[in-house]
Amino acid sequence: MKSNICLMAALTSLFAILAFNGTANAQQQEQPDIYEQAEMEADRLQRVLDLEDWQVFYVDSTLKHDFPAMMAEYEQLRNAKVGNTVMYQDVRDKWLDQIDATYKRIFTEEQWATYLKQGAAKAQKARAKRKAKAQGGDKK
């Protein structure tokens, strides 16, 4: 009886692991690469902000440069076996601040205001709050 219970538990665990791996692999295969993500974001911003073609080009170029650069910094942290999630967040914040600064130069005032209303203002405030907290923590 005990062996049947152990066997059932082992089979259930094995099934769960295989199902999880299958789901993870399917999600990995379905997820677009970084350049496709940049294109999708540029297309989304074109629809939402009614961007002109030259603006879409600059947004796309910015994202295709900055996304891989951010990922390269993540990879450096991973290779250095950095486990501090704050450091990863700092890298992300740095690159998103840079992207927003570029967007501000590309967008008209109306487009920028719409972009901020779409959630960017909240994200910027959160990044500024984290930065202030980190700087305040260094002074202690």
Could you say what each language-model-derived stretch is?
Residues 26-140:
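Charge-rich (acidic/polar
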Residues 1-31:
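Bacterial Sec-dependent N-terminal signal peptides
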